[in-house]
């Protein structure tokens, strides 16, 4: 098997100059040298720490003066205590590079540490450092499994240093969440933290608040949370009586003929009706004009959404069907996007397409993007295996620097040059042949595919060829940790979508490392990618599964000119087609062209991120103003005071009835009534404002046809609408207080009409999801609760 290069870093990282790293926000050599000097000095205190009993070690940690982490002379002692505590509680002795990583996180950086280098332990030490400095720390993960696993694993270490630790999952009750947040360090997924922040915006009693004020966010898999999930808005929504999308329309669209009634573009990212298709729809609906003012924003939109669902959204690629329900697949992780759904019209169209009962629709009550959620924290830091490749986004959107941490042992993984084929069919044949060839030697193979359908097709062909293989994809993601842990066993062949199993180490010889030496002699884990991703960072994540902690390993990517990356970002007439008898492209330019396509794709994704951020930034600013007003109403007597000033006669009338028997109780009840009314109408006004913003965003791109700037127009309309929000809410509250009927035989007023919904879900809305070729609804799922 050909091996053309040895990498001691992720591909291309070794060629990045110090100046370029700085442009990406990387820490300077001076910063790194200072951190290493403190790590080396910590060794002087190791013996003293080892002589302390558990109680003495705990007291020593609590006596450290770490208020100013940048200048504290106690940092070396802290590192020595942390190393000793880790040794006693986890059986792991942190390497110097792990302590270096912890220090760079304490300096506010995102650290790049390769797979298997011990990020979890390094992050726990950094979290302990912040907590000992008096900060409240949220360790933010990508899912509930990792939040609980890491909290339970690192809990004894945290407690050995005199600190408290808690965790939150989707099953946690409100009381359990409050208890976890009261701890010095709280582990939770980004979704759960976001949901708690949103739900707190519906409480009407200060004692019902769950989420604390944000302080320190330490983010695991930082690139996934801060880049891949940055644009995902977590949305709190409530049940409503909005109309369900018309099923007759959805069924009608399903009967249309491709090419005759509708057409897709070359890369199958957009679909539109032909004239014949439009006439067929119009006739079926009684001769209407789809493009008339009456129908263009309603019926035509429904038709386009249904087309999108039927033609562009593919089962086992973008979603799976399980237990009579549609489950979305997270495009960057290759696993089920737990509790997620599309915007209602698209969700209903997909459900109808699959013959599944459509789920309930609703209205948005509040929303916050992951990016805005994280930017609430005064201090943000994190860790990942691929931070440098995300450096520009981290710097631009979070003002974060990146610190590359060297591996404890040199990375000796061999990365082969891409094998490029003219057609997908030729590529897939070559992939199967290559897997079989490597498997014959006993070397374990991990195959990374782009989607569920491809993983199952590769698995089917391997079984047919007599190669025993295990498939890991969104359909069996509950088993992923156990499956991926055995991917390094002798003779193992594991076919996996995207980054399934991320967060679980692949040890040579299997989880028990029984055949470690034998597998190492065979070359370690061999990673095969069945196509380049739209960002090099995801390629590097896949490659990084091999070569753990100085182990041997290898990787190779198979690509074709028919891959989505190439079709969307390269011109056909520039592709060399000369190939050998297997269909493999001979031209040495092939790999360079792939890299160019990837750079173009990355540029487009960055543009989309920046553009979406510009829309979301104003909404975030308006939300901050609303939250401040809401907190004032919730925590003070402002609601009562304003009502008393607005309607003094009615106020005194209600007050007299309430205080007739018990003055103190009556005053408290009156204050509660005023607060409930004010909060209800403020929340109602915000929900209406969000609905208005969603409506204008759906059509704002059309302003470009009139030579107007869509973003400027959106801002103008959003600012104008928000200007009257507070006054309108107060006026509505005044009217409610004046007109609310009295309760028979009881003092007070009837507030039964101010009932609040309880069902919540989240989803992502894009300006024009049916027309954007880089960020469509295919990759914009949301979370349903």
Swiss-Prot record:
Main location: membrane
Binding site for ATP: 98, 116-120, 505
ATP-binding among keywords: yes
Keywords noted in UniProt: ATP-binding, Cell membrane, Cytoplasm, Membrane, Nucleotide-binding, Protein transport, Translocase, Translocation, Transport
Matching SUPFAM superfamilies: Helical scaffold and wing domains of SecA (SSF81886), P-loop containing nucleoside triphosphate hydrolases (SSF52540), Pre-protein crosslinking domain of SecA (SSF81767)
Top EC class of this enzyme: translocase
Cell membrane in keyword set: yes
InterPro entries: Helicase_ATP-bd, Helicase_C-like, P-loop_NTPase, SecA, SecA_Actinobact-type, SecA_CS, SecA_DEAD, SecA_motor_DEAD
Enzyme Commission identifier(s): 7.4.2.8
GO biological process, any: protein transport by the Sec complex
Localisation: Cell membrane; Cytoplasm
Family matches, as Pfam families: P-loop_SecA (PF21090), SecA_DEAD (PF07517), SecA_PP_bind (PF01043), SecA_SW (PF07516)
Bilayer disposition of the protein: Peripheral membrane protein
PROSITE patterns: SECA, SECA_MOTOR_DEAD
The protein's role, per its UniProt record: Part of the Sec protein translocase complex. Interacts with the SecYEG preprotein conducting channel. Has a central role in coupling the hydrolysis of ATP to the transfer of proteins into and across the cell membrane, serving as an ATP-driven molecular motor driving the stepwise translocation of polypeptide chains across the membrane.
PANTHER family: CHLOROPLAST PROTEIN-TRANSPORTING ATPASE, SECA INNER MEMBRANE COMPONENT OF SEC PROTEIN SECRETION SYSTEM
Subunit structure: Monomer and homodimer. Part of the essential Sec protein translocation apparatus which comprises SecA, SecYEG and auxiliary proteins SecDF. Other proteins may also be involved.
This protein's name: Protein translocase subunit SecA 3
Organism name: Mycolicibacterium vanbaalenii (strain DSM 7251 / JCM 13017 / BCRC 16820 / KCTC 9966 / NRRL B-24157 / PYR-1)
Lineage: Bacteria, Bacillati, Actinomycetota, Actinomycetes, Mycobacteriales
Gene: secA3
